[in-house]
């Protein structure tokens, strides 16, 4: 299977590549639109700011490439957030706009520290193939200060002061707010499920 990990310059690419390798799959780290378009599965990991990620995607001519995709793509953490229409980060950033009418906001909770860092539960519907063989008691590893509120594309939610989207899907575009590659067996199972969709 051809698996591409998008190199936005704003992510730890090694950890996701190692996690995929442990599942028995090879992947390629690339920012070449022609390779991305030919890949069967695509990962868009992201760490840092929406502004930096969008600048890199523009610079590498990947915005239109991403919008053309019909094969499954998984945005991880910031990768999911930039699928929204707009981020209030960095005084406002227009993002890719896959999840229409969805906006990324600062996680506002008066008595909890930011970033939201550590292990937390996700509340999901077992029937979705992304959650196959994942127990509802499992926890996943989060590191973020911005969220996408609950919306029509939300597949799973998490509470940290407020409830927010921790897994989203629109057609072939999937997103997770947590880091499956750092989430132990449950994260590995979710990656496996995505690769088998």
From Swiss-Prot:
What role does it play? IGPS catalyzes the conversion of PRFAR and glutamine to IGP, AICAR and glutamate. The HisH subunit catalyzes the hydrolysis of glutamine to glutamate and ammonia as part of the synthesis of IGP and AICAR. The resulting ammonia molecule is channeled to the active site of HisF.
Mind telling me which GO cellular component terms the entry cites?
cytoplasm
How would you summarize the oligomeric state and partners of this protein? Heterodimer of HisH and HisF.
Main location (coarse class) = cytoplasm
Q: Where in the cell is it found?
A: Cytoplasm
CDD domains, sorted? GATase1_IGP_Synthase
Instruction: Return one GO MF term.
Output: glutaminase activity
GO biological process assignments: L-histidine biosynthetic process
Is Amino-acid biosynthesis tagged as a keyword? yes
| Domain Glutamine amidotransferase type-1: start-end pairs | 2-197
SUPFAM superfamilies, per database record: Class I glutamine amidotransferase-like (SSF52317)
Q: Which organism is it from?
A: Buchnera aphidicola subsp. Schizaphis graminum (strain Sg)
Task: Please report the name of this protein according to its UniProt entry.
Answer: Imidazole glycerol phosphate synthase subunit HisH
User: Catalysed reaction per UniProt?
Assistant: 5-[(5-phospho-1-deoxy-D-ribulos-1-ylimino)methylamino]-1-(5-phospho-beta-D-ribosyl)imidazole-4-carboxamide + L-glutamine = D-erythro-1-(imidazol-4-yl)glycerol 3-phosphate + 5-amino-1-(5-phospho-beta-D-ribosyl)imidazole-4-carboxamide + L-glutamate + H(+); L-glutamine + H2O = L-glutamate + NH4(+)
Q: Its pathway?
A: Amino-acid biosynthesis; L-histidine biosynthesis; L-histidine from 5-phospho-alpha-D-ribose 1-diphosphate: step 5/9
Identify the PANTHER family for this entry.
IMIDAZOLE GLYCEROL PHOSPHATE SYNTHASE SUBUNIT HISH (PTHR42701:SF1)
What's in the keyword line of the UniProt record?
Amino-acid biosynthesis, Cytoplasm, Glutamine amidotransferase, Histidine biosynthesis, Hydrolase, Lyase
């Amino acid at each position: 299977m051809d698996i591409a990990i998008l190199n936005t310059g704003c992510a730890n690419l090694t950890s996701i590549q190692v996690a995929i390798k442990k599942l028995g799959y090879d992947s390629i780290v690339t920012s070449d639109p022609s390779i991305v378009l030919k890949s069967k599965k695509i990962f868009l990991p992201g760490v840092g700011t929406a502004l930096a990620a969008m600048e890199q995607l523009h610079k590498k001519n990947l915005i239109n490439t991403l919008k053309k995709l019909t094969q499954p793509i998984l945005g991880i953490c910031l990768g999911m957030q930039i699928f929204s229409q707009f981020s209030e980060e960095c005084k406002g950033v227009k993002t890719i706009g896959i999840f229409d009418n969805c906006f990324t906001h600062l996680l506002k909770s008066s008595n909890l520290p930011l970033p939201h860092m550590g292990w937390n539960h996700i509340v999901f519907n077992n029937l979705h193939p992304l959650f196959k063989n994942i127990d509802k008691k499992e926890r996943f590893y989060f590191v973020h200060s911005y969220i996408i509120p609950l919306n029509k594309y939300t597949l799973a939610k998490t509470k940290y002061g407020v409830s927010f989207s921790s897994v989203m899907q629109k057609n072939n575009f999937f997103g997770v707010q947590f880091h499956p590659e750092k989430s132990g067996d449950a994260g590995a199972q979710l990656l496996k499920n995505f690769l088998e969709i």
